[in-house]
Design a protein with these regions (language model features):
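Alpha-helical membrane-protein architecture signal
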Residues: 91, 109, 113, 117, ...
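Transmembrane alpha-helices
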Residues: 183, 187, 220-252, 276, ...
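Periplasmic/extracellular loop-to-transmembrane helix junction in inner-membrane transport proteins
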Residues: 48, 52, 78-128
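Generic hydrophobic transmembrane alpha-helix motif, especially the helices
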Residues: 156-192, 199-200
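Short cytoplasmic-facing helical segments at TM-TM junctions of multi-pass membrane proteins
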Residues: 192-238
Length: 310
């Protein structure tokens, strides 16, 4: 016989009783306390620290490089008998030179500011003429194989010629120092624009030209819709190289032609044995060239071509 045991509803609803004598019961009877969570530290640096690091890495290396240059300059000037002035002496001379950079006491006695402006004017004229001739010539040479085979040997022959070799030709033909200097800038700065533009045209994908041929596009449409957008990064690279070449050439040309210009100013200071002014002119020439390069890079980055930005 099976006997059944019935519990009342009150007994069923009562909570279970745990013995406090057992270890489990003691543990359950004690109040549970949680340890405070450790603060979470982000492994990523903050935006402010990243910005500071970026500025620090952008400023510190150039400053250290300039400091090394000044230190080397000081050591050479102190240990040798070459007559090179020390940095402090050159700095004092620079303060005097730039106290009135635009004075004018005659056609051959002008401040360094007027000389730099005269050189920049010649560079602008010579470079502008070179761009007007060199860029279209580069497109034509790159577009037509016959012209490429025709002019490539001439470019390879004339491009390595020194600027000083072109200057006497300019003096002979133009009968003047200023046109001869502009001619020298023109003939020396035209080659980078021709070569880079032609290379850019030749590297346009052939599929683009095949599509243009299927659509029966005119040469003008091919130039404006296909060639120019594709060649623009190469063209801008050629322009940058040409400006640097033009600025290098004008200094050498003005040393020989005389008149007003930063090259003539350097040569005149050498005749006066003013070495401090020559060193100042070297820094001025470098800074102006750096500014020209920076301006062209900013112009190039206005376009969305990765080749230009890199």
């Amino acid at each position: 016989m099976v006997s059944a045991v019935f519990h009342s509803p009150l007994e069923a609803s009562a909570p279970p009783v745990t013995s406090t004598h057992s270890p489990i019961g003691k543990a359950m009877s004690k109040p549970q306390t949680e340890a405070p969570a450790a603060p979470v530290v982000s492994a990523r640096p903050s935006a402010a620290s990243r910005d500071f690091r970026g500025v620090w890495m952008a400023v510190l290396p150039p400053v250290l490089g300039l400091a090394c240059l000044v230190l080397l300059w000081q050591l050479i000037a102190s240990t040798s008998n070459s007559g090179i002035p020390k940095p402090a002496e050159t700095w004092a001379q620079a303060l005097e030179v730039f106290s009135d950079p635009f004075y004018s006491e005659g056609p051959n006695d002008q401040g360094i500011g007027w000389n730099v402006l005269a050189s920049l004017q010649r560079v602008a004229i010579g470079f502008g003429l070179a761009a007007l001739v060199g860029i279209p010539a580069g497109f034509a040479i790159g577009r037509f194989e016959f012209l490429s085979r025709m002019f490539n040997p001439l470019i390879s022959l004339l491009r390595p010629v020194s600027p000083l070799a072109w200057l006497p030709i300019g003096l002979l033909v133009f009968k003047g120092a200023n046109p001869a200097a502009i001619w020298t800038i023109f003939i020396c700065s035209i080659w980078p624009m021709i070569i880079n533009t032609a290379v850019g045209v030749q590297r346009v994908p052939q599929d683009y030209m095949n599509v243009a041929r299927v659509l029966n596009l005119s040469e003008w449409k091919i130039f404006t819709k296909i060639l120019f957008p594709a060649v623009l990064p190469y063209l801008l690279t050629g322009v940058r190289l040409a400006v640097g070449t033009a600025w290098l050439v004008i200094v050498a040309a003005e040393m020989l032609t005389g008149g007003v210009g930063i090259g003539f100013w350097v040569w005149d200071e050498w005749n006066n044995l003013n070495v401090s002014s020559i060193i100042i002119a070297i820094f001025v020439i470098g800074i102006v060239g750096l500014l020209l390069e920076f301006a062209l890079i900013k112009i190039a980055t206005l376009f969305t071509f990765e080749e230009v930005k890199s």
